[in-house]
């Protein structure tokens, strides 16, 4: 939890209360009774793991080494069209943003993925010079995801078979973007 003031009790901040409740519910874990194919609803607390996979793949290391699955995907669809991701390090609504990039430029807010379309790689000046790409106006982080049209409860109610993914434990995706892991604090 990051905050500019401590006027709100810690337990009421962010998702602390919900996560602590889930931890008590997970004392006696139960395996899924059978293998199934279904839908995944990824909660905001879990989403950062998956965002890290994407942003790591569009940053200097993977773009310079040409191992990114997104290296030739600028202005192309890479996610569901309902997904929009912004990096807003200088937004007044972000308490743990930043004003200067790692390579010394003034940071700006931007949109990384717009309605599923990759709009930028997160290249530093070094990465841009090495690849001929464009230097990003920020280094990512301070993420804001646009809200969908339906509340979480309605989404869950309309799923016949699936999982509400609250925590994920797994390795980095393979070179082709596939991943595997364990669902934790999930229902």
Segments predicted by a language model, with ranges:
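Generic preference for well-ordered secondary structure
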Residues: 3-7, 24, 58, 63, ...
């Amino acid at each position: 939890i990051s905050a500019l003031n401590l006027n709100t009790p810690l337990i009421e901040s962010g998702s602390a209360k919900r996560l602590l409740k889930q931890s008590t519910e997970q004392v006696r874990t139960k395996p899924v009774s059978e293998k199934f194919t279904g839908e995944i609803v990824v909660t905001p607390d879990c989403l950062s793991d998956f965002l890290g996979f994407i942003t790591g793949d569009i940053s200097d290391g993977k773009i310079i080494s040409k191992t990114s699955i997104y290296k030739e995907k600028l202005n192309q669809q890479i996610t569901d069209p309902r997904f929009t991701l912004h990096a807003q390090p200088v937004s007044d609504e972000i308490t743990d943003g930043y004003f200067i990039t790692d390579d010394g430029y003034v940071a700006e807010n931007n949109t990384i993925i717009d309605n599923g379309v990759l709009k930028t790689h997160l290249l530093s000046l070094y990465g841009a010079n090495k690849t001929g790409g464009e230097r990003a106006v920020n280094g990512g982080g301070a993420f804001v995801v646009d809200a969908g049209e339906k509340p979480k409860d309605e989404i869950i109610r309309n799923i016949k078979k699936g999982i509400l993914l609250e925590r994920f434990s797994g390795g980095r995706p393979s070179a082709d973007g596939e991943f595997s892991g364990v669902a934790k604090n999930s229902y």
